[in-house]
């Protein structure tokens, strides 16, 4: 088993952990539907940047 040569100081420990922080997800609002979605992802309704890009099951039911 590996054993450290000397005790790690709180400063050194903090420097090692400096990249471990979580960041909040970036959310956007679609201009057409007003739906909130992740950046660079389509909405649940199939819209991306205000345009319909994919046919969804819910929209197919509404059209029938």
UniProtKB/Swiss-Prot annotation:
The keyword Cell cycle is assigned to this record: no
Keyword Nuclease attached: no
Region feature (Disordered): 1-36
Any one of the GO CC terms: large ribosomal subunit
Taxonomic superkingdom: Bacteria
Keyword terms of this UniProt record: Ribonucleoprotein, Ribosomal protein
InterPro entries: Ribosomal_bL32, Ribosomal_bL32_bact, Ribosomal_zn-bd
A single GO molecular function term of this UniProt record: structural constituent of ribosome
GO biological process, one term: translation
Family: Belongs to the bacterial ribosomal protein bL32 family.
Protein name as catalogued: Large ribosomal subunit protein bL32
Species: Stenotrophomonas maltophilia (strain K279a)
Gene: rpmF
């Amino acid at each position: 088993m590996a054993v450290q040569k000397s005790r790690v100081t709180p400063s050194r420990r903090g420097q090692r952990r400096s990249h471990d922080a979580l960041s909040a997800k970036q959310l956007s609002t679609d201009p057409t539907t007003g739906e909130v979605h992740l950046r660079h992802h389509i909405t649940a309704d199939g819209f991306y940047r205000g345009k319909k890009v994919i046919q969804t099951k819910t929209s197919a039911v509404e059209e029938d």
